[in-house]
C-alpha cells in the first residue's frame, strides 16, 4: 500500500486497523484485555523512567540523565512553563527502542516541590520533521504489548480506545499508588503543506499524581 497516496479523510481508520491488527502477538489474544487485574500478573510499579524516579531534585534528575544516556547538563534544554510554573529538562535520544527513531524526553519538576512529577517521551512530529507512520505505530504497539504484561488498577485501565478525532489512547494504567502510565497516538488531519500521515505523534507519559498535579493554579476565592 502506498501510504502517501491514501485518501486524506481516512488516515485514522488506517491507524486503527494497524493497531487492532497487532493485538495478537506471541500467540496471545489481547483484543479483550480485561480489567488489568489478572491474579497471575505482577503489579506494575510506575515510579519514573529508567534511573529518574518521582521525587528527585533537578540535580538528581540531571545525574540520572547522565547515567542513562551519557548526556551532560550542557546538552539538557531547561525550560520554565509560564502557565503552570513548572520546570522541564529536555533531551533528544536516538533509538530508545530498536528502529524507533529519535525521541524527545521531558522531565518535569513540580511548581512547589521542585521535584520530579512527570516524564514525557515523544516520537514523531515535531521531534522528527517527516516521521515514518509505520515506525510510529509499531513503536506504539511494542510499548502497549510491554505494558499489558503487568497488573493495574481496574479504574482507568484502557487499551486501544479512540478518544477524539485522530486521537487514540493506546494504553493507560494506574499502579497501586495511583501513579499512571499513558500512551497516546495522535494523527491530525491534513494541515497546510504537511503530507497525509506526516503529522503523527506518539506520546508516552509517566505521571506521579494525575489527580493532584504540582502545578500553579489560582485558588478558589482569589479572583
Residue ranges and their predicted role:
Residues 2-5, 26:
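Acidic, Ala/Val/Gly-enriched low-complexity intrinsically disordered segments
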Residues 4-14:
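Bacterial N-terminal signal peptides that target proteins for export
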Residues 13-23:
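Bacterial N-terminal signal peptides
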Residues 32-85, 118-223:
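Non-cytosolic coordination micro-motifs
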Amino acid at each position: 500500500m502506498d501510504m502517501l497516496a491514501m485518501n486524506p479523510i481516512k488516515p485514522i481508520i488506517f491507524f486503527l486497523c494497524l493497531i487492532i491488527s497487532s493485538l495478537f502477538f506471541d500467540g496471545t489474544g489481547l483484543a479483550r484485555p480485561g480489567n488489568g487485574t489478572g491474579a497471575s500478573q505482577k503489579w506494575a510499579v510506575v515510579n519514573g523512567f529508567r534511573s529518574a524516579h518521582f521525587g528527585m531534585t533537578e540535580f538528581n534528575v540531571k545525574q540520572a540523565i547522565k547515567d542513562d544516556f551519557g548526556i551532560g547538563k550542557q546538552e539538557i534544554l531547561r525550560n520554565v512553563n509560564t502557565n503552570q510554573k513548572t520546570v522541564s529538562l529536555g533531551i533528544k535520544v536516538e533509538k530508545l527502542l530498536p528502529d524507533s527513531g529519535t525521541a524527545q524526553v521531558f522531565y518535569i519538576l513540580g511548581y512547589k516541590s521542585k521535584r520530579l512529577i512527570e516524564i514525557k517521551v515523544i516520537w514523531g512530529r515535531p521531534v522528527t520533521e517527516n516521521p515514518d507512520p509505520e515506525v510510529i505505530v509499531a513503536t506504539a504497539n511494542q510499548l502497549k504489548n510491554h505494558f499489558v504484561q503487568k497488573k493495574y488498577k481496574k479504574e482507568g485501565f484502557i487499551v486501544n480506545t479512540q478518544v477524539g478525532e485522530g486521537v487514540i489512547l493506546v494504553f493507560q494504567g494506574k499502579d497501586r499508588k495511583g501513579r499512571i502510565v499513558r500512551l497516546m497516538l495522535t494523527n491530525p488531519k491534513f494541515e497546510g503543506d504537511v503530507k497525509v500521515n506526516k503529522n503523527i505523534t506518539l506520546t508516552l507519559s509517566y505521571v506521579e499524581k494525575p489527580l493532584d498535579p504540582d502545578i500553579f493554579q489560582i485558588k478558589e476565592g482569589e479572583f
